[in-house]
A protein has these predicted regions:
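Flexible hinge/capping segments at coil-to-helix
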Residues: 145-163
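Short helices/loops that flank or line small-molecule/ion binding pockets
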Residues: 87-88, 96-97, 101-114, 128-130, ...
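Short beta-strand->loop
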Residues: 130-137, 187, 224-236, 246, ...
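A ligand-binding cleft/hinge motif common to bilobed small-molecule-binding domains
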Residues: 102, 119-127, 174-177, 200-201, ...
């Protein structure tokens, strides 16, 4: 999960220089510029990936998608799903932790081959990257201390509250763009896990995170069992996809494999293992 090759680091620096020092929002012009350098050459992406014999997959840690299990090994829905797809395609998965706010820079610098970690499909992202068909549904929800679960039901209730979301995420877009939060005080964090820690410690009042994360992290006996999702208030219905460099032919390869795993029932089997089966949409070859 470390960047090991010097020429890749040089590429990352070059890409960062091209896009400038602000990549805080996928809707920024910097994000658009980040996609440009590799669009013309990405057609041969699959040859590049298969030639290495491995697919370098950019992730962040959050349960139940990618996390370290009790045995000390990486596990989770996305981990198992990506492993199954790579097996079908004849390459090895190589999971690499990234800073979510710099995901497109990492992608275009070829320090990773794809972003596979609960990536919300948006028009802006589709303009900058080649994204597979959707494989999971999601929404943004509020998480608070359990004793405050009934406190934040209206925009008036949220006035003056301290809100945290992951920088560059759909949660951040909700925090900044929804009228519900316009009189709250927003602060970004560099991961969804840190958002929960902010609420747990009392530094923030409300975390805006992926609904699927609550399934894995707020269960009884977990480190966050003292937190609770606010019922009846959710935002930004969305779907997840896997992002490759703009113009990449690897995107279609993976989409075709997703369809196969869905038709075989393997995708649903993996989702059920992590209590995510209700989040799997109907998938077919014409879904893109």
């Amino acid at each position: 999960m470390k960047k090991t090759l010097a020429f890749l680091m040089a590429g990352a620096m070059a890409a960062a220089a091209l896009v400038g020092c602000s990549a805080k929002n996928d809707t920024s012009s910097a994000a658009s510029d980040a996609a440009a350098p590799t669009a013309a050459t990405a057609d041969g992406d699959w040859d590049y990936i298969s030639g290495k014999g491995e697919m370098t997959i950019g992730i962040t840690y959050f349960e139940p998608m990618n996390y370290i299990g009790e045995d000390g090994k990486l596990t989770g829905f996305e981990t198992d799903f990506a492993t199954a797809v790579c097996k079908e395609l004849g390459v090895e998965p190589k999971f690499q932790e990234i800073e979510w706010d710099s995901k497109e820079i990492e992608l275009n610098a070829k320090t990773i081959d794809c972003i596979w970690n609960g990536l919300t499909i948006t028009a802006e992202r589709e303009a900058n990257m080649s994204i597979t068909l959707p494989y999971m549904s999601n929404k943004q929800v509020m998480v608070v201390k359990a004793e405050n679960a009934d406190k934040y039901k209206t925009a008036a209730d949220v006035k003056g509250a301290k809100v945290v979301a992951e920088a560059g995420s759909a949660g951040e877009e909700v925090a900044k763009g929804e009228d519900f939060f316009k009189e709250a005080t927003y602060t970004p964090a560099d991961s969804q896990a840190k958002c929960l820690l902010e609420v747990k410690s009392g530094t923030s009042d409300i975390a805006i995170i992926d609904y699927v994360m609550t399934i894995g992290t707020l269960r009884a006996g977990s480190d966050y069992s003292d937190l609770k999702m606010v019922e009846g208030q959710d935002f930004s219905p969305e779907v997840y996809g896997i992002a490759f460099r703009k113009g990449s032919d690897a995107s279609q390869k993976v989409s075709d494999t997703i369809v196969k795993l869905y038709n075989d029932g393997k995708l649903q089997e993996i989702a059920k293992k992590y209590n995510l089966e209700e989040q799997i949409p109907k998938i077919n070859a014409n879904a893109e």
